[in-house]
Amino acid sequence: MNPEKDFAPLTPNIVRALNDKLYEKRKVAALEIEKLVREFVAQNNTVQIKHVIQTLSQEFALSQHPHSRKGGLIGLAACSIALGKDSGLYLKELIEPVLTCFNDADSRLRYYACEALYNIVKVARGAVLPHFNVLFDGLSKLAADPDPNVKSGSELLDRLLKDIVTESNKFDLVSFIPLLRERIYSNNQYARQFIISWILVLESVPDINLLDYLPEILDGLFQILGDNGKEIRKMCEVVLGEFLKEIKKNPSSVKFAEMANILVIHCQTTDDLIQLTAMCWMREFIQLAGRVMLPYSSGILTAVLPCLAYDDRKKSIKEVANVCNQSLMKLVTPEDDELDELRPGQRQAEPTPDDALPKQEGTASGGPDGSCDSSFSSGISVFTAASTERAPVTLHLDGIVQVLNCHLSDTAIGMMTRIAVLKWLYHLYIKTPRKMFRHTDSLFPILLQTLSDESDEVILKDLEVLAEIASSPAGQTDDPGPLDGPDLQASHSELQVPTPGRAGLLNTSGTKGLECSPSTPTMNSYFYKFMINLLKRFSSERKLLEVRGPFIIRQLCLLLNAENIFHSMADILLREEDLKFASTMVHALNTILLTSTELFQLRNQLKDLKTLESQNLFCCLYRSWCHNPVTTVSLCFLTQNYRHAYDLIQKFGDLEVTVDFLAEVDKLVQLIECPIFTYLRLQLLDVKNNPYLIKALYGLLMLLPQSSAFQLLSHRLQCVPNPELLQTEDSLKAAPKSQKADSPSIDYAELLQHFEKVQNKHLEVRHQRSGRGDHLDRRVVL
């Protein structure tokens, strides 16, 4: 520093002492400055006061020499003390050089800067609030200072500033929030602790409504909640807990919509505490805001659904996620199916599938359902508990369906999540069928694929969804449209039957009984599509047919009309080109028909053949059952067409008898001994009126080798009374009771011809296969 420079009104002694390395001498100089400034205040000499402050600032506090900077700091503090209540007029000039010293490399100098600013603030009190942001900014840096003395000094200043803010009603929160939002993302644990402590203080001040600005800082708070320091996490939990209490207390002033996506992001984090806290907030938001949260459903589901598959290690998160899921589901009502028509202009705002899927961890979605719906977020700022339930919110399904489809397609996802997805789909088809049927073609393949799931419960829920699709009036169209995917389109063309056959199927009205739901649903155009593709899946995945086929078909018979299911499958199988599969499928359907309790009513309907509908069903089943000779006979036994059964067995002599064929005859004999055929066994007592039944059974006996089944049937026939009555002369003339006299519409001769035609086709295919094999064998020998 130039000793000859003029520092007036500061005397040379003061200047010399301010530059001294000893603190005591600098302190003496400060007292002299205080005395000098007091005189200027008494004289109201503002020019000289400003000159003193400027000199101390420019020539000392901002000097290159460290001792000069220390002298400048203590001198500025002395000026503030001397100015007293008038210091508010000069605060900018007093504070700025001191704050500059906060960045000094010398820790002692940073400490003196804290001390000087403490004295300045202590004198000015509330007058410093217009400069709060710069003070806060400086303090936030010192909070992370490595020097313990500096940190201690900054804490004293921090407490003083908090006291001033608490006792004042002039705090400018609007100007402060941008700075808070910026500083809240600091990764330093001391800076985080400093930020949290200030939020707690501001939250406790009655005149400061921090809740209005919660969307600005909520994301930062959740990030601080993941801090490694236990104390900081605890402090942050307290802050978030206080905010949540305020939200519950005053939901009308909460900007739910602006915070929804923030919660969605943190509900997907890997940190258990953050995830649980965010999920608890989401639960409260859904319950308090109601339908306001609907536009964010796809994001919420993206976050919530995976949590439903958590194990007991994350039981708390799982339980809260389940409440969120159930609460959100309840918000969807039948009125949501009508909103597009009531307000057609809003259709344009529906998010596209690309926009609708919420972004994953680390990025927030732009708006409701992940799309930028500014009209929604800007249009709602204040909600009341009552009004939110009736808020005119449009439910857009694109994003929701995409999320559900994505989770159902993910084979790694947990069972409970898949069940929840299927429950959602079922709920949406019940509440908003017209909207959902726009998405059915995209959902259909994955729903069919889910039938191969390992869990019975998943398959049950999947079948409920498929049954609802197949029976909902909203799915009734003139043309169900092309199926999704090339292989499904191929299956459609491969298994499709002519339209008249379909029309006849869909109009079939069977007896409503145990096989039907309480109110048998009307089948729509998707029903036939479902049957076609289900059979196609059984054809391509034989293990599914073997392991789950009976279970799937029995459940469908409970959910839908059993008669329609059997009628349609028989109709489709009649045109199946893979004859081996057709035979296998017919055998499976026949076993289900004869053994399942769910089909008791349908069996009774077929047993009597009293109505035209039952006769038509018999003829339809018969034509497909012809793919398997033994099942055809069992169908005749079920319907008490014993003469035709005998005629069929006579034709067995012309068939190729294989091991599989004999095994099926063996199973039929076992079935005859079951309760299902009790009526048939009792009819053996009436030999006179049932000669063809006995002949048919003897025919089966003659087909069997000497086996356990042969012995079983032989013993049964030995119990028939008066066997000589089998040779009755008038048996060909009389119409036995077993051959329905009241079924003139059934042309049994034509049915027998059809049986021969189908079996010849099977024989031809087998010969073609064996011919190719023989040809290959000959080539090998040569």
Curated annotation (Swiss-Prot):
Residues where Phosphoserine is found: S517, S743
Entry keyword annotation includes Membrane: yes
SUPFAM superfamilies in alphabetical order: ARM repeat
Effect of L782G: Reduces interaction with NOS1
Positions bearing Phosphothreonine: T11, T499
Predominant localisation class: membrane
Keywords: Acetylation, Disease variant, Endoplasmic reticulum, Endosome, Host-virus interaction, Membrane, Microsome, Neurodegeneration, Phosphoprotein, Repeat
GO biological process, one term: regulation of postsynaptic neurotransmitter receptor internalization
Molecular-function GO term, any one: identical protein binding
Biased composition (Low complexity): 478-488
Role played: Scaffold protein component of the PI(3,5)P2 regulatory complex which regulates both the synthesis and turnover of phosphatidylinositol 3,5-bisphosphate (PtdIns(3,5)P2). Pentamerizes into a star-shaped structure and nucleates the assembly of the complex. The pentamer binds a single copy each of PIKFYVE and FIG4 and coordinates both PIKfyve kinase activity and FIG4 phosphatase activity, being required to maintain normal levels of phosphatidylinositol 3-phosphate (PtdIns(3)P) and phosphatidylinositol 5-phosphate (PtdIns(5)P).
Name of protein: Protein VAC14 homolog
The species this protein was found in: Homo sapiens
